[in-house]
Structures are given as C-alpha cells and as structure tokens.
Regions:
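Active-site rim helix/loop that mediates acceptor-substrate recognition in acyltransferases
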Residues: 26-58
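C-terminal "cap" of GNAT-fold acetyltransferases
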Residues: 131-170
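Short amphipathic alpha-helix that is part of the acyltransferase structural core
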Residues: 1-38
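Conserved acetyl-CoA-binding loop-helix of GNAT-fold acetyltransferases
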Residues: 88-101
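Conserved active-site alpha-helix within GNAT-family acetyltransferase domains
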Residues: 115-134
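Conserved beta-strand in the GNAT
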Residues: 53, 60-69, 74-81
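Active-site acidic-Proline motif in GNAT/NAT acetyltransferases
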Residues: 83-85
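Conserved GNAT acetyl-CoA-binding A-motif
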Residues: 103-115
Length: 170
C-alpha cells in the first residue's frame, strides 16, 4: 500500500536538466491515457513551468505530478495527474497542499482551467469560478495576505471548509 508518509515531492524544471526531466516525464507527455485524463490536451512545458513530482522515497517511478506556470503577477496551475494505483490514498491531497503552499509563499494569485465538475473540488481551497466556456471553467484564487478582501490576514493555506463552492454561469 502506498501511503503519503512513504512518499516525497520534488520540484523539477526541464530547463535545469532537460535530459533527466524527459527521461522521467516523457512517458506522461506521450501517453494517450494521460492526455484524455488531462482534458484531451497534450501536456506542455516551458521556461516558466515548475513540476511538483510525487514518488515513493527511494524510488524513481513517478506516481503523479502537478505542473504550474509562474508569471510575475499570477501562477497558473496547468496539469495534474495521479496514476490509477495511487488514487484514493490521500496522495493527491498531499501533492495539492504542497503546491498551494508554494503558491501562498509566492504571494501570487492563482488561476486554472478545469472541467466544470472539478470546480466544487477546488472551492474549499480558495478557488472561485471566474468564467465559464462550454463545460470548462476558469477558476481564480486570490493571493493570500495581499488582497483587501483578506483584511490583512497572514499568508498561509486556505482553511478547509465543508461548504461546496457554487458554480456561476457568467
């Protein structure tokens, strides 16, 4: 059984070591299954991308990842994937918390595009529907500790709530 405490999360950038990056991540870029699960679009990488990669400690086999694209004023969550055998074990929760913690440390707003059904899963983590196009939504998460709506609250993870965010149709 794979448990979160048996795993490590690494931060990778292809520009640091392109050969090593694609030797490990290439199978995900080439996989039709990963493409289908990531909305039908191929994975992309670029100079502003950072990959949070989850694997068992001492093992090189990647169990999952979240990619983000950091710009001076916003972070875009791009792609997320977890192998089927690693699902339902709290691993994605651990990965998501690490990524959002990183975004909070940067003090930047965060945006992502996702299928409409996923909006309710991201609502408890500070994301709100910004716009809708077909079955996809753009979600925004304000920068923590820097926005006037936070009343000067300190930077940190968004507290989990039991309320589900409502989806707007703009």
């Amino acid at each position: 059984m794979i448990r979160p405490q048996d795993c490590e999360i690494l931060q990778w950038r292809s520009f640091d070591d392109e050969a090593a990056f694609f030797a490990s991540m290439g199978r995900f870029f080439a996989s039709a299954r990963v493409r289908r699960e990531c909305g039908g679009y191929p994975l992309s990488d670029g100079p502003y991308h950072r990959w949070f990669v989850l694997r068992r400690q001492g093992d090189t086999r990647i169990l999952g990842f979240v990619s983000l694209e950091q710009h001076p004023d916003v972070v875009r969550l791009r792609d997320a994937y977890l192998r089927a055998e690693a699902r339902g074990r709290g691993l994605f929760r651990t990965l998501r918390e690490r990524v959002l913690g990183h975004v909070d440390q940067l003090g930047l707003a965060c945006t992502t595009r996702a299928p409409q059904a996923c909006a309710r899963l991201l609502g408890p983590h500070g994301f709100a529907v910004h716009s809708t196009r077909g079955s996809w939504v753009t979600l925004m998460r304000k920068a923590h500790g820097t926005d006037k709506d936070t009343d000067g609250a300190s930077r940190g993870a968004v507290r989990r709530t039991t309320r589900v965010a409502a989806c707007r149709a703009d």
